[in-house]
């Protein structure tokens, strides 16, 4: 990880850029501490394309080239207000940590705009990425207001969203044509 902060995917981070789960946890803990332990209005959005990671396997997703990572980052930053943070997770997912969200409707609206921005960036990529964008969400006070619990809730939500997306793709696949050997 560079100390120069030149990783454009997380250039929105407040200090020398860091990625990964530990950086997300540190940032969440800092934001909660600065709010006097009151995490109300704090939301974590994990955005990914392809299958979500699990504890035993890396995610199954098409790789994003650097130009696409830059474009996804640019579009995600355009959706969220300037006081929010954008980082990259351990498995390449994008993490948006947002403050000042007032209710579940605002959180869901923000999530929809983030997914749309991510999807637009993938569709506009020079190397078109055919993948479903999934989002995992955790929002305080609906989830435990500790940093670890918020991030874990967002990770679980992302896994569930990826499973639903994968099931939906299977249902939409056209039936295989009948084989000639059956005749």
Label every PLM stretch briefly.
Residues 1-14, 22, 156-183:
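C-di-GMP signaling machinery
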Residues 9-29, 36-44, 50-77, 87-91, ...:
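Conserved long alpha-helical elements within nucleotide-processing catalytic cores of c-di-GMP signaling
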Residues 24-25, 104, 108-109, 115, ...:
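Catalytic-core segments of nucleotide cyclases and related cyclic-nucleotide turnover enzymes
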Residues 34, 78-83, 115-128:
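Short catalytic/binding micro-motifs of nucleotide second-messenger systems
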Residues 39-41, 85-86, 128-136, 168:
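Residues at or immediately flanking beta-strands
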Residues 48-50, 83, 89-96, 134:
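Short acidic-rich active-site patches of cyclic nucleotide enzymes
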Residues 49-52, 101, 140:
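Hydrophobic pocket-lining residues within nucleotide cofactor-binding pockets
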Residues 93-99, 123-157:
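A short glycine-enriched loop-to-beta-strand structural element that forms part of the catalytic core
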């Amino acid at each position: 990880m560079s100390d120069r902060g030149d990783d454009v995917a997380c250039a929105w981070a407040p200090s020398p850029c860091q990625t990964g789960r530990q950086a997300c946890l540190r940032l969440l803990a800092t934001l909660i501490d600065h709010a006097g332990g009151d995490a109300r209005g704090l939301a974590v959005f994990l955005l990914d394309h392809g299958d979500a990671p699990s504890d035993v396997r890396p995610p199954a997703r098409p790789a994003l080239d650097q130009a696409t990572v830059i474009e996804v980052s640019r579009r995600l930053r355009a959706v969220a207000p300037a006081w929010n943070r954008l980082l990259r997770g351990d498995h390449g997912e994008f993490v948006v940590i947002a403050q000042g969200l007032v209710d579940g409707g605002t959180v869901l609206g923000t999530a929809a705009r983030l997914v749309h921005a991510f999807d637009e960036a993938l569709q506009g990529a020079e190397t078109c990425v055919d993948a479903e964008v999934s989002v995992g969400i955790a929002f305080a006070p609906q989830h435990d207001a500790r940093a670890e619990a918020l991030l874990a809730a967002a990770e679980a939500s992302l896994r569930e969203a990826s499973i639903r997306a994968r099931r939906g793709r299977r249902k939409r696949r056209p039936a295989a044509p009948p084989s000639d050997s059956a005749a």
